[in-house]
Amino acid sequence: MKVVVIDSGTGNLASARRGLEIAAGRAGLDAKVIASADPLDVRNADRIVLPGQGAFADCARGIAAIEGMRGAIEEGVAAGKPFLGICVGMQLMAERGLEHEGAPGFGWIKGEIAPISCPGLRLPQMGWNGLDFTSTGCVHPLLNGLQADDHAYFVHGYALRDGDQAQILATTEYGGPVVAMVASGNRAGTQFHVEKSQEVGLRILQNFMVWTPEGTSGS
């Protein structure tokens, strides 16, 4: 199995790669995990991971600046390859981001990325926070082995707004419910830094490594 962590210049590549390697080992998989900015590697991948940090528009520009990368991602997803977006990588799955000048997203999940509304609370949200699973999340294979109120590590000031409840797997509480995890078909994303979320994050990554979304043949 070949897993590609996309290097768009804005992600935490080393931690994501290491987490995936540990997860593959726990799952008993013979997996090669690489970080790459080469669209050909993405086309040849069995699983695709897109980490991202910073502003939505900057991450979108990072993808656009690599000739052929957006097309390679779309081709992989259309072919049924499992995709995982991390932090801003998840946000890019939405229709649009409103940070700074605003920018279009991939349009894979409904909603836009907007500032968190939490009067009296510090922004960005930074630290450990509990996960609340939705009815969709409770039966989703990416959350197998996890329990309600398991904690994950967040660093963000923007979040998905006006999303489709059927695409939301988990929320967290920060001045109100904030979307923490989404999925649509073979595309999934975590607003939290799954690669920094210790055992909870490793469990999700392990689930991702063995995930066979409905309608795909697996890898």
From Swiss-Prot:
SUPFAM superfamilies: Class I glutamine amidotransferase-like
Domain Glutamine amidotransferase type-1 intervals: 2-218
Transmembrane regions: none
The keyword Lyase is annotated on this UniProt entry: yes
UniProt record, GO biological process: L-histidine biosynthetic process
Subcellular location: Cytoplasm
Pfam families reported for this sequence: GATase
Disulfide bonds: none
SUBUNIT field: Heterodimer of HisH and HisF.
Name of the molecule in the record: Imidazole glycerol phosphate synthase subunit HisH
Organism: Granulibacter bethesdensis (strain ATCC BAA-1260 / CGDNIH1)
Gene: hisH
